[in-house]
A protein has these predicted regions:
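Solvent-exposed loop/turn elements at secondary-structure boundaries
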Residues: 1-143, 252, 257, 266-269, ...
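Extracytoplasmic gating/loop element in the C-terminal half of outer-membrane beta-barrel translocons
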Residues: 23-35, 202-203, 221-291, 295, ...
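Hydrophobic, lipid-facing positions within transmembrane beta-strands of outer-membrane proteins
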Residues: 46, 56-60, 151-155, 208-214, ...
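Outer-membrane beta-barrel channels and translocator barrels
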Residues: 55, 67, 162, 174, ...
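Membrane-spanning beta-strand positions in outer-membrane beta-barrel proteins
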Residues: 59, 65, 71-75, 166, ...
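Residue-level signature of outer-membrane beta-barrel architecture
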Residues: 64, 159, 216-218, 284-286, ...
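Gram-negative outer-membrane beta-barrel transporters
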Residues: 73-224, 234-238
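C-terminal beta-signal and terminal closure region of outer-membrane beta-barrel proteins
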Residues: 103-106, 308-357
Length: 357
């Protein structure tokens, strides 16, 4: 409809240049250019000088060959990203008072740590002290003010394929820190007027990663039965990702209901479950004359059938008290705080047949 003319012109011309006026829109939407915004309005806008994200990267490495087929290497990777998006509620003012003491429920201890509270009585008596426009709910402005930094060190041992055998052993130690991982998630700021307090481990931080992979061919190449076999094991381990502890309610009265943390809890202070798996691939190649071959494969994933938990119930309540560097546990149900809520697949085996010609 809007592509057929202009919206809200002065004296509307006729024909293809006709305008869409308020009277045209009235049967479909309410049009008003005057008056205050309805209570509970949520506004979204963009920073006037919004900038696109930028990244600076650097890396350095050294590699040493040992013998004819072995090598070792060490590498360092640095990535600094700036002007990342962050949704900031500009309706909140720093005049809200500091309060402390959230009583525990069902015998839980009280969290007595201080936090800034826009729901305090002083804000109810004098809303303009705490809110730029007390009549609206939120005024979210997308700003390019967040940044992130990544440091990674990689050690690697490698053997090129020779004598029917190859090997790769890799260890990565890394750390990722940022202000905001995703402005559409529960990682929004707990205190919108103290954004520096949000700087912590990134959602993608993973401190340790180990991979061991090998390929072994059958040494009996002249045997019709034992030749053509190939065995490829992979062992992998990843340490857990951080997760945010959430109160599950708007405890600080800022009209944001999904991002509040227990008072005093740093962002991403929980540590998620680690991952470990042993996978294998076994294949047998049979030549069918000079131009064709048949290959049977059997692949197994998570052969040890280890339970690799994926996510944690991070809603722990407003009265959750230190220590905050907690982990998930299988001792409680998924509906309880810190209970595991999902797991990755158990042991899987798949068979395949491939004909090449």
């Amino acid at each position: 409809m809007f592509s057929q003319g202009k919206i809200l012109c002065g004296a509307p011309p006729q024909g293809a240049n006709a305008c869409i006026t308020q009277s045209d829109l009235a049967p479909f939407v309410t049009v008003s250019n005057t008056g205050s915004l309805p209570p509970g309005t949520v506004l979204f806008s963009g920073q006037p000088d919004y900038r696109n994200p930028q990244a600076q990267q650097a890396s350095v490495g050294i590699e040493r060959q040992i013998g004819k087929s072995w090598s070792v290497s060490a590498n360092y990777i640095y990535v600094h990203t700036t002007h990342l998006p962050w949704a900031v509620d500009t309706n909140l003012l720093p005049g809200a008072p500091m309060v402390s003491g959230i009583p525990g429920a069902n015998g839980l201890p009280t969290n007595g740590l201080p936090f800034q509270d826009w729901g305090a009585p002083v804000c109810s008596k004098n809303p303009s002290q705490c809110f730029a426009d007390p009549g609206i709910l939120q005024n979210n402005e997308y700003e390019s003010i967040a940044n992130a930094v990544y440091h990674g060190g990689i050690l690697e041992l490698r053997k090129r394929f020779s004598s029917g055998f190859s090997l790769l052993a890799n260890y990565t130690y890394s750390k990722a820190v940022d202000d905001s991982t995703d402005f559409n998630s529960d990682y929004a700021a707990f205190n919108e007027v103290d954004l520096r307090a949000e700087r912590s481990l990134s959602d993608f931080d993973q401190r340790h990663k180990v991979v061991f992979a090998a390929v072994v061919e059958s040494p009996w190449q002249r045997s019709h039965i034992l030749s053509g076999f190939e065995f490829a094991p992979i062992v992998s381990y990843n340490s857990g990702h951080p997760f945010n502890l959430l109160a599950g309610a708007d405890i600080n009265g800022d009209n944001h209901f999904t991002n509040d943390r227990p008072p005093g809890a740093p962002r991403n202070s929980g540590l998620g479950p680690s991952y470990a798996a042993f996978d294998i691939r076994l294949s047998k190649r049979i030549n069918l004359g000079e131009r064709a071959n048949l290959q049977f494969t059997a692949e197994g994933f998570n052969i040890a059938n280890r339970t690799n938990y994926a996510t944690v119930n991070n809603i722990v309540g407003a009265s959750f008290a230190p220590p905050f560097n907690v982990r998930g546990t299988s001792a409680v149900s998924p509906s309880q705080p810190l209970g595991y809520t999902a797991a990755l697949p158990k042991r899987e085996i798949q068979l395949g047949l491939r004909i090449g010609f």
